[in-house]
Regions:
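Conserved radical SAM core fold
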Residues: 34-35, 74-76, 100-105, 118-136, ...
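Short glycine-enriched, charge-decorated loop/helix-capping segments at active-site entrances
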Residues: 34-41, 132-138, 199-203, 333
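Short, small/polar residue-rich loop motifs at catalytic or cofactor-binding pockets
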Residues: 261-265
Length: 374
């Protein structure tokens, strides 16, 4: 097993405290597939149990807990404010990932007083497209509430989910978030779950999008804009490697993992029913239940299968394995195989060894298996 050397003192827990939500987004993994048969929320005692289990984990591994609290919309949980006070008393930092509908200046000031570091909302297109994905009026309200967050001193974060459906609108979204003085902007790719979202984005189309966004980012940074552009997708590493913006460190140790996907490294997801998942976007990645299992034990047992880096069919042969590995969630959603090639990765050759990376046959078999053709 490769060692991980992220050099991070924080360990992140993405925590879904409720499924309750004001929207039914077309790309939401909670309502994908057969749909969410029952909206679940944790009880107050269960939430205290989760905090204690996460604190125990961090004590064992000498980390600091950092919660990404989400749902649904977490603010709809009946004990939301009790949780905010608990985290404040324990001095545990957190980000909220929710909707704009229940935010105003007073609520944002209260969140800031409880220690809220960042508040993440979504923009998945310009007005018509975003409101189609989410609900009418969502776009304008999201833009409006950025100001509430900024005035309260909470870092406003906008995340976009990219697919073939909206990829051509991402550059316009960048302009919009800069104009609104968003503090952080990032995008990640849609994980196929069925439904009305077009998933046919080709590797070269996605690379072109990164090229366009990179030019925009540089222009805005040069102009001194307030927005920080977080290059969240790990295929940014491949793009920057090709364009000379990322160099392989000369002192990198063989077998070490320095970056790339955090699944199995410094991240755990806890769902509203207590299920512990390696990644929320990998729908079949349940490894335990937070009410039945000690997270510190799960980490060295059940989570181990997500740290077998030599199993990556394409990435294991690539010189960027220690820094990239694409998005296994997208690979899994496309082919049903966590270790399959990332469908938007355009790299075909190891530039150091000359070895071919493209594994058409393996990817084809995975796709045919998923479609029931084999």
């Amino acid at each position: 097993m490769s060692q991980y050397n992220g050099g991070k003192s924080y360990f992140s827990f993405q925590w879904h405290i409720t499924d309750e939500c004001d929207q039914r987004c077309k790309h939401c993994y909670i309502f994908s597939g057969e749909g969410c048969k029952e909206l679940k929320s944790m009880t107050w005692n269960q939430m205290k149990e989760v905090v204690a289990n996460c604190e125990d984990f961090c004590k064992v591994y000498n980390r600091i807990p950092y919660f990404y609290i989400t749902g649904g919309d977490p603010i709809l949980h009946p004990d939301f404010w009790k949780l905010m006070v608990l985290l404040k008393l324990k001095n545990i930092p957190f980000t909220l990932m929710g909707n704009p509908f229940h935010l105003d200046d007073e609520i944002c000031r209260m969140l800031k007083a409880c220690g809220c570091d960042k508040y993440q909302m979504s923009l998945d297109g310009m007005r018509e497209t975003h409101d189609w994905f989410r609900k009418p009026g969502s776009f304008d309200l999201t833009i409006e509430k950025i100001g509430c967050l900024n005035r309260a001193g909470i870092k406003s974060v906008i995340m976009s989910t990219v697919s073939k459906t909206n990829m051509n609108e991402i550059p316009d979204i960048i302009d919009e978030v800069v104009k609104a003085k968003v503090k952080v902007f990032a995008f990640s790719r849609y994980v196929p779950t069925g439904g009305e979202v077009d998933t046919s984005m080709t590797p070269q189309e996605y690379r072109k999008l990164l090229e366009i966004c990179d030019a925009k980012y540089k222009a805005y940074e040069k102009a001194g804009c307030e927005t920080y552009f977080n290059k969240k997708d790990h295929l940014w590493t491949l793009y920057e490697y090709e364009t000379g913006q990322f160099k392989l460190p000369e002192n990198a140790e063989k077998g070490m993992i320095y970056g790339g996907c955090n699944c199995g490294n410094c991240h755990i997801t806890i769902s509203s029913n207590g299920d512990v998942m390696a990644c929320r976007r990998v729908t079949d990645s349940k490894v335990a239940n937070v009410f039945e299992d000690r997270l510190a034990d799960v980490w060295i047992c059940q989570m181990e299968k997500y740290r077998n880096y030599d199993r990556f069919e394409k990435c294991s042969k690539c010189e960027l394995k220690a820094w990239c590995r694409g998005c296994p969630a997208v690979a899994n959603g496309t082919s049903g195989n966590f270790y399959a090639p990332d469908p938007q990765c355009w790299k075909t050759r190891n530039e150091i060894t000359g070895e071919e990376l493209l594994m058409e046959s393996s990817l084809t078999v995975s796709l045919e298996n998923r479609a029931g053709l084999r």
